[in-house]
């Protein structure tokens, strides 16, 4: 544009009616902020990549990731530098505008010059204002030249300041065909999974009747390779060791409890635990003192032991042996109830369990008929009076 061909009213009016340098200053601030963000992002990328590659993620995948991200990090650093240059150029453009604005003649001065010229020309009846008119025209010419020079300088400075290096687009970090490959792989995997599931269900339905029929025969015939599907045989082979281990693990506490109960029963029968053992332990000091002191003579008896038939019983069996039930029809058999008093629930048993077979031979005592009809005598119940 030829600013010299334009009057000062146009050049000055354009400079004063525009938005000024505020947009360029704001643009410079924005470019500075973008450059700082890109620099921080590049540093963060490099730190994360270094940490993953040296401490947490090793192998071919890590190498491929670094190779894919390294160009992007380099692009961010280069773009940050270009953003800083753009900010500097925006500040230079704002400075050029301020310089041109300061050199431009203000529009009010130009308007005043034109008004004075009009007044001088109007009142120049006898030529008395000729010199003043010439001076006013010369002043206007100077304004014209000053505006033209300011606009030429501003055009040159702004042209240099606004030459921004074109920004390069970011590099691709993924393969362009990766999306299509991934979609095809997902579709193929979904189809394969669905087909495998349908095939497994069809195989299960086909072999289910044969398997159910094979359950009626021994297990070995049901597990033959000809009648059992491969997946069922694999499941059984996998499950049997686990079930045996589970059975052994769960049954081990019950085995220990059974051994403990057996030992407790044996010790109680032998009198090692229970009330008799406590009484024997309490009487032990007195027995020891009596044996040491020798306060009384040792006495013994002959023929005083309790008997069962013609057999003599040990002394500690006398209280535990049940009373012998008299034979039916004998002189000593009263017609009363044959219910005998049971031992206390808390009393400990012994090894022979209180001679449970002591009265089992009463039927062979010859009191009743050995063959044929046996006469049964019932005792009168207490509630009959």
UniProtKB/Swiss-Prot annotation:
**What Pfam families does this protein map onto?**
PPE, PPE-SVP
What InterPro entries does the entry give?
PPE_C (IPR022171), PPE_dom (IPR000030), PPE_sf (IPR038332)
Q: Which processes are annotated in GO (biological process)?
A: response to host immune response
Q: Point out the coiled-coil segments of this chain.
A: none
Similarity-based family: Belongs to the mycobacterial PPE family.
Protein name per the record = Uncharacterized PPE family protein PPE22
What organism, scientifically named, is this protein from? Answer: Mycobacterium tuberculosis (strain CDC 1551 / Oshkosh)
């Amino acid at each position: 544009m030829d600013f010299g061909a334009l009057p000062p009213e146009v050049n000055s009016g354009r400079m004063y009616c525009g938005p000024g340098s505020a947009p360029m200053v704001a643009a410079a601030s924005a470019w500075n902020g973008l450059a700082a963000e890109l620099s921080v992002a590049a540093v963060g990328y490099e730190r994360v990549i270094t940490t993953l590659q040296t401490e947490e993620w090793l192998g071919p995948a890590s190498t491929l990731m670094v190779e894919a991200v390294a160009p992007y990090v380099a692009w961010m650093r280069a773009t940050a530098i270009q953003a800083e240059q753009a900010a500097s150029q925006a500040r230079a453009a704002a400075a050029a505008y301020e310089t041109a604005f300061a050199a431009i003649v203000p529009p009010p001065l130009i308007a005043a010059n034109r008004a004075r010229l009009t007044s001088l020309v109007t009142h120049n009846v006898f030529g008395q204002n000729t010199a003043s008119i010439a001076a006013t025209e010369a002043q206007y010419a100077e304004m014209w030249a000053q505006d033209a020079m300011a606009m030429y300088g501003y055009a040159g400075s702004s042209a240099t300041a606004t030459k921004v290096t074109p920004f390069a687009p970011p590099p691709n970090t993924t393969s362009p065909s990766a999306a299509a490959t991934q979609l095809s792989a997902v579709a193929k995997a979904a189809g394969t999974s669905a087909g495998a599931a349908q095939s497994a269900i069809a195989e299960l339905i086909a072999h289910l009747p044969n398997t159910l029929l094979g359950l009626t025969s021994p297990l070995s015939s049901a597990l033959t390779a000809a009648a059992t599907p491969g997946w069922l045989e694999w499941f059984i082979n996998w499950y049997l060791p686990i079930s045996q281990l589970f059975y052994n693990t769960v049954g081990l506490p019950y085995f220990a409890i059974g051994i403990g109960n057996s030992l407790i029963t044996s010790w109680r029968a032998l009198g090692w635990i229970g009330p008799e053992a406590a009484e024997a332990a309490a009487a032990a000091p007195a027995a020891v003192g009596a044996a040491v002191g020798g306060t009384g003579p040792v006495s013994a008896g002959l023929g005083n032991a309790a008997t069962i038939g013609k057999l003599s019983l040990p002394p500690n069996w006398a209280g535990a042996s049940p009373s012998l039930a008299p034979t039916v029809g004998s002189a000593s058999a009263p017609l009363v109830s044959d219910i005998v008093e049971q031992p206390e629930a808390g009393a400990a048993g012994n090894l022979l369990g209180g001679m449970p077979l002591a009265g089992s031979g009463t039927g062979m005592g010859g009191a009743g008929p050995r063959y044929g009809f046996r006469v049964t005598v019932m005792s009168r119940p207490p509630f009959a009076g």
